[in-house]
Amino acid sequence: MNASDASMTVIGAGSYGTALAITLARNGHRVVLWGHNPAHIQALQAARCNQAFLPDVPFPDSLQLETNLGQALAASRNVLVVVPSHVFGDVLRQLKPHLRADARIVWATKGLEAETGRLLQDVAREALGETIPLAVVSGPTFAKELAAGMPTAIALASTDREFADDLQRLLHCGKSFRVYSNPDFIGVQLGGAVKNVIAIGAGMSDGIGFGANARTALITRGLAEMTRLGTALGADPTTFMGMAGLGDLVLTCTDNQSRNRRFGMMLGQGMDVQSAQDSIGQVVEGYRNTKEVLALAQRYGVEMPITEQLWQVLYCGKDAREAALSLLGRTRKDETAKL
């Protein structure tokens, strides 16, 4: 493959980054995949699959592995960043000196900036400047199913109409992968952060043994919290009824492929936070997101009782069952008031 003819460079060779790279390559595009660990990239190249996360999915011939960041970024103007949210800013700053003059950045990272709770668009602007086109993809996607070619749908939002159209064309596959465009850049970002938090709560409820009624109540009221916060930030509330909101929320709250849900289940069964994280063995985005989302809600004066109780469990040692009872014992409310 020539150095500058790739349709996309993917930054991040974990399960989701690899799955997206495979999907793009399967669509007939030339793709470069880079990861921060050269030994890992060399292992992917030798096996022509991601044996750690997706061992049963071979790489298409048009998927190239690259250990050199400069060469990876020279290969395409389109750069897809798929890294944990707590390193998102650091990775963008690492990329900046190597980006092409015509570069465009899209991310599939879900979450907020660690400590500050800022939206990733603000982190990207600070790291990359005001002129580079930005985009985000988000929605109900488990890496294993996406990589296997199972039917999947996501949402896409961008600051640049041409970039959005190009991304939709690159990603969309009529056989398995449907990409919906959405003009709500804020809402598509926020949904992916809040759903991580609520998924921990849903898992915790199931771990305690509360059953389907309680899980459904948590999903429904979690969606209300997501919508309230999004509206306060200027998002379109209808976004949260779509793929980046309700879609992703239902997926992560109900299926054990979700690390956030499994983490919550372990807490509900009595495991401590550190042991549960160690048992998962991968990043549990919702753990950090809980603190970040709550800080953002407090900054905007938005009531988020589920998020607050989860913060009490994760960071203050509150018992999971006691947190659930605190929610049930709250003052009576009108369901649709300030939804």
Swiss-Prot record:
Per its UniProt entry, which superkingdom is the organism in?
Bacteria
One term of GO molecular function: NAD binding
- What gene name does this entry carry? gpsA
Q: Which family does it belong to?
A: Belongs to the NAD-dependent glycerol-3-phosphate dehydrogenase family.
**EC number(s) per entry:** 1.1.1.94
Organism of this sequence: Pectobacterium carotovorum subsp. carotovorum (strain PC1)
Compartment(s) where it occurs, according to its Swiss-Prot or TrEMBL record: Cytoplasm
Q: Which residues form a coiled coil?
A: none
Upper lineage is: Bacteria, Pseudomonadati, Pseudomonadota, Gammaproteobacteria, Enterobacterales
Kindly state which keywords UniProt assigns to this record, in alphabetical order.
Answer: Cytoplasm, Lipid biosynthesis, Lipid metabolism, NAD, NADP, Nucleotide-binding, Oxidoreductase, Phospholipid biosynthesis, Phospholipid metabolism
Metabolic or biological pathway? Membrane lipid metabolism; glycerophospholipid metabolism
Q: What is this protein called?
A: Glycerol-3-phosphate dehydrogenase [NAD(P)+]
Q: Catalyzes what?
A: sn-glycerol 3-phosphate + NAD(+) = dihydroxyacetone phosphate + NADH + H(+); sn-glycerol 3-phosphate + NADP(+) = dihydroxyacetone phosphate + NADPH + H(+)
Q: Where is the active site?
A: K195
NCBIfam families linked to this entry: PRK00094.1-1, PRK00094.1-2, PRK00094.1-4
Which sites bind sn-glycerol 3-phosphate? K110, G139, T141, K195, D248, S258, R259, N260
For the keyword Oxidoreductase, the answer is yes
Physiological role: Catalyzes the reduction of the glycolytic intermediate dihydroxyacetone phosphate (DHAP) to sn-glycerol 3-phosphate (G3P), the key precursor for phospholipid synthesis.
Where do the annotations place NADPH binding?
A: S15, Y16, H36, K110, A143, R259, V283, E285
Cite the Pfam families for this sequence: NAD_Gly3P_dh_C, NAD_Gly3P_dh_N
Gene Ontology BP annotations: carbohydrate metabolic process; glycerol-3-phosphate biosynthetic process; glycerol-3-phosphate catabolic process; glycerophospholipid biosynthetic process
The answer to whether keyword Lipid biosynthesis applies is: yes
Enzyme class at the top of the EC tree: oxidoreductase
Annotated Gene Ontology cellular components are:
cytosol
